[in-house]
Amino acid sequence: MTYFVLFLGLCFVLGGLAVASNPSPYYGVVGLVLASVAGCGWLLSLGISFVSLVLFMVYLGGMLVVFVYSVSLAADPFPEAWGDWRVVGYGMGFVAVLVAGVVVGGFECWDLGMVTVDSVGMFSVRLDFGGVAMFYSCGVGMFLAAGWGLLLTLFVVLELVRGLTRGAIRAV
């Protein structure tokens, strides 16, 4: 089980690197799907099945919208692939920054600990609902900030896709 969780963590990091160094929206969405599946699988392996399912459904809906808009904006007949030297350079640069951050910060700052509510014997399902309660009690500010950011992103994408048309107002 430890190796499986380590594999999911590695897939999550590689998916994030694929999104950060995406040469084309066609390949960037593959990185998004890989990162979201690995992250939700990671949560599922920790026993947080409800939150994992909700996040997976939200990620799939959001990724579908972002993929459709980004493909409509950048319809290249010959998209760059991940094997191009420019893209490989971006990926190596991101890995170098990640390794430098670990070397400078050290591994001690990652010891956040784990707090469980009631995960003994038959009550292991309580852990999942305790996490949902923590989302809405302590994480309400982050939810509001994330919702505001997503709303702003939606309007920015809609404005970019609209182009020069004025909607119902016509030029005289």
From Swiss-Prot:
Q: Which family does it belong to?
A: Belongs to the complex I subunit 6 family.
Q: Write down the chemical reaction(s) this protein catalyses.
A: a ubiquinone + NADH + 5 H(+)(in) = a ubiquinol + NAD(+) + 4 H(+)(out)
Record lineage = Eukaryota, Metazoa, Chordata, Craniata, Vertebrata
Per UniProt, the keywords (alphabetical) are: Electron transport, Membrane, Mitochondrion, NAD, Respiratory chain, Translocase, Transmembrane, Transmembrane helix, Transport, Ubiquinone
Q: What does this protein do?
A: Core subunit of the mitochondrial membrane respiratory chain NADH dehydrogenase (Complex I) that is believed to belong to the minimal assembly required for catalysis. Complex I functions in the transfer of electrons from NADH to the respiratory chain. The immediate electron acceptor for the enzyme is believed to be ubiquinone.
TM stretches of this protein? 1-21, 27-47, 48-68, 87-107, 138-158
Q: Which organism is it from?
A: Uria aalge (Common mure)
Where the protein is mainly located, per its record? mitochondrion
Entry-linked PANTHER family: NADH UBIQUINONE OXIDOREDUCTASE SUBUNIT ND6, NADH-UBIQUINONE OXIDOREDUCTASE CHAIN 6
Q: Which domain of life is it from?
A: Eukaryota
Q: What is this protein called?
A: NADH-ubiquinone oxidoreductase chain 6
